[in-house]
């Protein structure tokens, strides 16, 4: 039996129904609400043949305790990770310069979930991670992702350096974030096909991953702390890339 998790909130439930309805096993909505957002969720659930419960708000509070569920909750299967062939298909079928996020050694499911959420907001084509020494899609990661685990392809690869080399041969520029780099993120042209590489919580990028990057950049740190959480740093890098692309 597949692992399942609970997602809550209008946007999260609607995203799961639109992008991964096959993995949604049941949906609960607040019975007394009749607004358009609830009607959309009800319609999407019924059209996909998903078990739908219209219940009191107190029951939603029990299913998703301590969460601002906004009157909508769903039980969702943990999505299966994709592989190298799926990445090739995604890359060759996109019409815009791809933006990819590579996570090397992220082991905390909360961080993975937060990175997926940032990736979704930034329009990332896929999130890539190695199979070894990295967390995969878990119920916790999916819960933190708030629907992004269903909308952003998560690719697990056997050999990360080999995947980076393949991306480079296909015209993707690979930029890694490293505190000791001399070049600032804000001095770097991030237009065009791009993969941003972020290291794990403790040791950052592994040596071979670092050496495989086309360029290493740093996030200027103006305070007393030396580094940022990987999900925060990922969001900063992704949205700087988007800022540059929007201003072209």
Where are these regions (language model features)?
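RNA substrate-binding interface of SAM-dependent RNA methyltransferases
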Residues: 15-18, 22-23, 29, 38, ...
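Structured adenosyl-cofactor binding patch, chiefly the S-adenosyl-L-methionine
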Residues: 121, 140-148, 207-248
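Active-site/ligand-binding-proximal alpha/beta "capping" segment
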Residues: 175-231
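Hydrophobic/aromatic ligand-binding patch that stacks against planar heteroaromatic rings
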Residues: 44, 118, 166, 208-209
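N-terminal positively charged helical leader segments and presequences
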Residues: 1-90
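Conserved RecA-like P-loop NTPase ATPase core
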Residues: 9, 111, 119, 174, ...
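A short acidic, often aromatic-flanked loop/helix-cap motif at beta-alpha or helix-coil junctions
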Residues: 58-63, 80-82, 160-164, 183, ...
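Short basic, glycine-rich beta-strand/loop surfaces that mediate nucleic-acid
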Residues: 63-77, 145-148, 153-157, 191-199
């Amino acid at each position: 039996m597949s692992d399942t998790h609970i997602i809550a909130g209008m946007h999260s439930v609607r995203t799961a129904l639109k992008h991964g309805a096959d993995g949604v096993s049941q949906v609960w909505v607040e019975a007394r609400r009749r607004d358009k957002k609830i009607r959309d969720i009800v319609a999407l659930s019924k059209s996909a043949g998903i078990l739908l419960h219209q219940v009191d708000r107190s029951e939603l509070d029990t299913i998703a305790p301590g969460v601002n569920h906004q009157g909508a909750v769903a039980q969702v299967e943990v999505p299966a990770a994709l592989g190298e062939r799926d990445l090739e298909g995604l890359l060759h079928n996109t019409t815009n310069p791809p933006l990819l996020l590579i996570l090397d050694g992220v082991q905390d499911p909360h961080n993975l979930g937060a990175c997926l959420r940032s990736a979704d907001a930034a329009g990332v084509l896929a999130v890539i991670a190695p199979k070894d020494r990295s967390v995969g899609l878990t119920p916790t990661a999916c819960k933190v992702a708030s629907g992004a685990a269903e909308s952003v392809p998560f690719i697990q690869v056997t050999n990360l350096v080999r995947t980076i080399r393949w991306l480079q041969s296909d015209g993707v520029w690979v930029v890694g974030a490293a505190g000791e780099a001399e070049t600032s993120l804000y001095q770097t042209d991030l237009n065009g096909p791009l993969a941003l590489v972020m290291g794990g919580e403790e040791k950052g990028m592994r040596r071979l991953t670092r050496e495989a990057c086309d360029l290493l950049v740093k996030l200027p740190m103006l305070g007393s702390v030396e580094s940022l959480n990987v999900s925060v740093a990922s969001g900063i890098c992704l949205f700087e890339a988007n800022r540059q692309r929007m201003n072209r």
